[in-house]
Amino acid sequence: MGKYMEKLYEIKSNLVKYKNRVGLKNKEFTIISNNCWGGFVYQKFGLEYRTPFIGLFIFAPDYLRLLANLKEVIFSEVNFIAAKDSKYVEDILVNNELPKYPIGVLGDNIEIHFLHYKNEKEALEKWNKRVKRIDFTNMLIKLSDIDRCTEEIIREFDSLNYKNKLCFTAKE
């Protein structure tokens, strides 16, 4: 009975994704996000990931620096560091322990926290595969006011020269 229910759930899930996708006029967009939100959007519509920003997060100050020079920085080599060497070490401690997920550094010391990846090899393979799918002419740039986001960062984000920007904030 378990396999039957799993198959039924899979069929239902695919039908829901199809129904969601039917209303989309634009199905080949790139989401640049400072957290996992973009992955949820692609999953809801059953779309291929067209971004490397899946299963990871970037602290707001680094994210803003990345966006300021996206085309120049995004294709630079990802180098990995130990969690103890993160400039955000106080922020990532959980119960006084360092996280086990990989932390990559891109460009000029922009940290990428690969939260949902097992190891550096997996993180790098997924990043390199997905970064090639970015469509710079069809992007949605999203910021959430988490991970050291300030009102000043939100103002700077708003001033960036991107056509489609979205900011989720609880700040006034």
Where are the model-predicted features located?
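Positively charged, amphipathic N-terminal segments that serve as targeting/anchoring signals
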Residues: 14-27, 32-156, 167
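A generic structural motif
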Residues: 164-172
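Short hydrophobic helices that act as membrane-entry/anchoring signals
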Residues: 2-13
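Short intrinsically disordered, low-complexity coil segments enriched in acidic
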Residues: 1-2, 172
